[in-house]
Structures are given as C-alpha cells and as structure tokens.
C-alpha cells in the first residue's frame, strides 16, 4: 500500500501486481479501505487495484446540491460534489495512476451510503468510469431520482450494482422511507436501457456489515 494527501484528503492505493488489472475508486466514511480491500481479495475474484479516499467532508463532498438535514439536530447537506469531483478527476486520479504499473483495463467508482449517491452522480459529470456500485446508497436524497430520470450519463456504463439492507426503508423518517422504492426504480431504469445491472437485498439495516456489503459490490463488478 502507498498513500498520498491532496487538499486534505488522504488517498490509499492498494495495487495489483497485474499491469492490466482494473482500478476501482472508493470514497470512504472513516478510512475503511484496507478492510474492504482485504475482504474483496479474499473472495478470489480477478485482481484489481483499489484507490480509497478518506477524510472527506461527508455531507458536503458527497452531495450534489444543498438540502436540509435528514436527521434532527444534524448538519444540513451543502452541495460540494462538483468541486470534489473536479479534485478527483483532475488531481487524485492522475496522481494515483502514476503510482501503478501499466494501464487499467477499466475504471470503476463505488461507495456506501452518501458515497453511493456520489458514484451515481459522478457518471453524469464525467466519462472516466465504466462500472458503478452504490451499496446502501442514499438514493432517498431529495431530487436525485428525478435528476437521474431526466439527464444523460456522460458515457454508457458497462454495468451497475446496487444493494440495500431489507430494514433500511422501515423507518418513521419520511425521507429515508423512500430508499428501497427509489433504489429499485433507479435500478429498473438503467436495466430498461439495456445496461447490465444487479440488485442485492441484504438482511439488516443501514449500519450492518458495511465492509462486507461494499466488498460484495466490488466482487460483482469484477465478475462481469
């Protein structure tokens, strides 16, 4: 593993020894990149390089526009995804890919929770990613489903993976209650366009087995 820092973000690279191995970009909540990498590698799927970014402004960097907080006494969302995506595409990706040997066969982006929301938003702004994973993605976020249905991606993804805990929508919170319906409708929307999509409903709530669920998303993308 090697690491570097850009604009107060910490970037950890878990490299493959294969020169054409795909590269996957993962935005993390609390620096869980190594655990996710080890869990995915243990599953004996094809080799890959993981680039995990941490120290993010979670409620700013991962969201596309401003929105009130989804929780009582929590900070509001302040849309900083465009600025962070510019940092990712113009600085983080070029720096990371100078550190690895060879040229990746494909480039993917995925994330959990708000990072899953960001992964989807990213493909509407850049054509750098051909595979996408949104695990327990915050697809309840106000306006996101409508944005997806009314805009075109910058390039057609090769495949897209979605997963959700089966208890995530069972809440009194009216925003979060929509997450399963929104996720299923969004997955069906992409599937209807002929894109290879997967949807996995896992037992548990939003906070159960995040590492394992994220690793499962990586493995699904690698299996296509």
Give names to the regions the model predicted:
Residues 2-17:
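A short loop-to-beta-strand scaffold at the N-terminal edge of the catalytic core in hydrolase folds
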Residues 10, 20-99:
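Serine-hydrolase catalytic machinery in alpha/beta-hydrolase-like enzymes
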Residues 20-22, 47, 104-106, 129, ...:
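A general structural motif
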Residues 40-41, 123, 187:
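A conserved amphipathic alpha-helix that caps or lines the catalytic cleft of carbohydrate-
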Residues 106-111, 135:
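Short beta-strand immediately N-terminal to the catalytic nucleophile in serine-hydrolase-like folds
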Residues 110-115, 119:
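Gly/Ala-rich beta-loop-alpha elbow adjacent to hydrolase catalytic centers
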Residues 121-131:
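Conserved hydrolase catalytic core segment
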Residues 139-221:
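The feature captures the conserved acid-bearing segment of alpha/beta-hydrolase catalytic domains
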């Amino acid at each position: 593993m090697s690491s570097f820092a850009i604009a107060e973000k910490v970037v950890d690279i878990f490299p493959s020894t294969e020169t054409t191995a795909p590269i996957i970009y993962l935005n993390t909540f609390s620096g869980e990149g190594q655990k996710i990498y080890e869990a995915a590698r243990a599953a004996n799927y094809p080799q890959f390089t993981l680039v995990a970014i941490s120290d993010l402004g979670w409620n700013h960097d991962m969201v596309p526009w401003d929105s009130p907080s989804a929780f009582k006494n929590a900070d509001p969302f302040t849309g900083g995804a465009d600025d962070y995506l510019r940092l990712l595409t113009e600085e983080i990706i070029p720096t990371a890919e100078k550190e690895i040997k060879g040229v990746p066969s494909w480039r993917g982006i995925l994330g959990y929770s708000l990072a899953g929301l960001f992964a989807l938003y990213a493909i509407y702004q850049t054509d750098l990613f051909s595979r996408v994973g949104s695990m327990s993605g915050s697809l309840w976020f106000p306006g996101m489903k409508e944005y997806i249905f009314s805009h075109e991606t910058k390039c057609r993804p090769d495949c897209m993976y979605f997963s959700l805990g089966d208890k995530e929508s069972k809440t009194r919170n009216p925003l979060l209650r929509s997450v399963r319906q929104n996720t299923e409708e969004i997955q069906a929307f992409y599937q209807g366009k002929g894109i290879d999509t997967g949807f996995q409903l896992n037992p548990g709530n939003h906070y159960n087995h995040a590492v394992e669920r994220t690793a499962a998303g990586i493995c699904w993308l690698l299996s296509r």
